[in-house]
Curated annotation (Swiss-Prot):
One of its GO terms (cellular component) is cytoplasm. This is Dihydroorotase. GO terms for molecular function: allantoinase activity; dihydroorotase activity; zinc ion binding. Binds 2 Zn(2+) ions per subunit.
């Protein structure tokens, strides 16, 4: 691996530095470049654009294996590199689900060949033996979709994971209430083409009940919880009370931060997601971000055909890898978010929560994962010229100010000027 010097980098505290990269690792951070380094290394002039640690997305659905019509490890990680991400962690709900050692190994082999960024895998929860067997493969966490299981099943699954010392990532919606609401609302044929009805079926109360149950199980089994895509202010209040005594981290998604259920009027079923977009009585906004520990895109791509069905049959999910950073940098320019907060939420904290070694900081000895941003670049978000297979976004035509212009993964430039480049990716554990 050739060495690289990043010249004239502006840090988030407005210092101009040069970063010396050797064998994919940050060797040094200096104010000047030594003559020997000028002669032997590749020099890349950053031109006083701002550098931040490469973004880490701990919540993506790359659909590979089994659903490659939606996304693949190639297209999904190209989208990640293009969006400023250097590390992603994939969710287990592929076909087959990543809930056995064999399925875990098969997915990792696919990712190793195809991925444009470094990666980890969350494991599903099946039997106790499967949970124990997967431990040798070093999963980032175990993941449970609470809306798919009964209380008895959840109790057993929490128990299994408690024996691993791994985090438990949770999708928090109450199965009984969601099933009842959907069954009731389906009886009215007028609801078939009203996407907003879906948000009432998967109600704020369903999230609150599930989170409360998760907290009680965490007390019982002494687990580290990572609560994915929390979507209501009321749930946040409950979690913060519990955080005083329990090890809990909270994730926000860009679509829950920047959208509400009025989006359904403009965008219909293409904005359908789980949990759904909330109304103003419940929804979180950029002003609530200081209450969260991390931002995950919940990048959940589908085909246009799968999205353009009626309210109940349309696939739920929104792509986010190529829009998230633009949305967040716009809020930095709007003075509603600081770069320090952005770095914590998208890099430092995700690395800490999931114990990812040598990532999340621009620091001597760490992986040279760096995202270069131009805070003055302007434009409109468009699905054109994106790498994801999911050719839709509820942020279409939204103005942005600030964008990533280069992504560097372990000293390799993997994205620049809207192009992406492949180098050897690695499993992060």
């Amino acid at each position: 691996m050739s060495n690289l010097v990043l010249k004239n980098c502006k840090t988030i505290d407005n210092k101009i530095v040069n970063i010396i990269i050797e064998n994919g690792i940050i060797k040094d951070i200096k104010k000047t470049i030594l003559p020997s380094e000028k002669e032997t290394d590749t020099i890349c002039d950053i031109k006083e654009n701002i550098i931040i640690p490469g973004l880490i997305d701990t919540h993506v659905h790359l659909r590979d294996p089994g659903m490659t019509q939606k996304e693949t490890w190639t297209t999904g990680t190209q989208a990640a590199a293009h969006g400023g991400y250097t590390t992603i962690i994939d969710m287990p709900n592929t076909l087959p689900a990543t809930d056995t050692k064999k399925a875990f190994q098969e997915k990792r082999n696919i990712a190793t060949k195809k991925s444009y960024v470094d990666f980890g895998l969350h494991a599903g929860v099946k039997t106790r033996q499967d949970v124990m067997d997967i431990m040798s493969e070093k999963p980032a966490s175990y993941k449970i979709f609470m809306d798919l299981y009964t209380n008895k099943q959840l109790d057993e699954m929490f128990n299994y994971v408690s024996q691993t010392n791994k985090p438990l990532s949770l999708h928090c919606e109450d199965k009984t209430l969601v099933d009842y609401n959907i069954k009731t609302m389906k009886k009215n044929p007028l609801n078939k083409n009203k996407t907003i009805t879906y948000s009432y079926a998967r109600s704020a109360l369903a999230e609150l009940i599930a989170v409360n149950r998760a907290i009680e199980f965490a007390k019982k089994y002494k687990l580290q919880l990572h609560l994915c895509h929390i979507s209501t202010r009321q749930t946040l209040e409950l979690i913060h009370e519990a955080k005083e005594k329990l090890n809990i981290s909270i994730e926000a998604t860009p679509h829950h931060i920047f959208l509400d259920n009025t989006t359904y009027e403009r965008y219909g079923v293409k904005a359908k997601t789980n949990p759904p977009l909330r109304d103003s009585n419940y929804n979180i906004t950029i002003d609530n971000l200081n209450e969260f520990d991390s931002i995950g895109t919940d990048h959940a791509p589908h085909t246009i055909e799968e999205k353009e069905k009626d309210t109940w049959k349309s696939a739920a999910g929104i792509p986010g890898l190529e829009t998230a950073l633009k949305l967040l940098l716009t809020e930095v320019n709007n003075k509603r978010l600081t770069l320090e907060q952005l770095v914590k939420l998208t890099s430092t904290n995700p690395a800490n929560i999931f114990n990812i070694p040598n990532k999340g900081k621009i620091k001597k000895g760490y992986d040279a994962d760096i995202t270069v941003i131009n805070m003055k670049e302007t434009g409109k978000i468009s699905i054109e010229n994106t790498y994801t297979k999911a050719k839709y976004t509820p942020f279409e035509n939204r103005d942005y100010v600030g964008s990533n212009i280069m992504t560097i993964n372990r000293g390799n430039i993997i994205s620049q000027d809207n192009d992406v480049y492949k180098y050897d990716s690695k499993y992060i554990y």
